[in-house]
């Protein structure tokens, strides 16, 4: 494999593993001189390799960028043992990243479930919805938005009650804000975190010592005009 092709393989690895080349047609039939067992083994290997590339889009996309000859070389490379190792490693990395994200969201929801059960003082009768039936999204600001529901089991003649809620939580499992419709207290109103965060806080105007003296003198003159100078002196 010449230097140009090696560099092209490195540059186009993401292109192919991300789905930018089409599976080429089935490999040419093995040599007629090979025995039957070797032919079967070769066919199985080709099928396995084709399956890994089968979900890639049109070969024309690759040809448009790299040219037909080089794209065919790259396709053949990813059918080789070395190319398959790279594809397998890429799939493993994508699976690990997906699992890590899923686990993080589940961890967040486990904390949310615990908070919901403890919030109303009847944890033994409070049943949060399952993670699969809930919405957990990570926002651009790093906070997690949770939308779900819970059920409080009734006692005696009381019926079971069903409620929905939404919540904001950071990655350290701190409750930032929440909204529990029908409840009482702090979280009985819609969430206000975003509204407060986006409010413009007026700038505190700094007053110089000279300005303070002028303001103080103005106040004294006002008091004198109201109560008289003698009254002001007596109260100093």
Curated annotation (Swiss-Prot):
List keywords of the entry alphabetically: Cell membrane, Lipoprotein, Membrane, Palmitate, Signal
Q: How does it sit in the membrane?
A: Lipid-anchor
Query: What is the protein's name according to its record?
Result: SPbeta prophage-derived uncharacterized lipoprotein YokB
Q: Which organism is it from?
A: Bacillus subtilis (strain 168)
UniProt lineage? Bacteria, Bacillati, Bacillota, Bacilli, Bacillales
**Major localization listed first in the record, in broad terms:** membrane
Give the positions of lipid attachment, kind N-palmitoyl cysteine. 20
User: Which portions of the chain have biased composition (kind: Basic and acidic residues)?
Assistant: 31-53
User: Record's GO cellular component, any one?
Assistant: plasma membrane
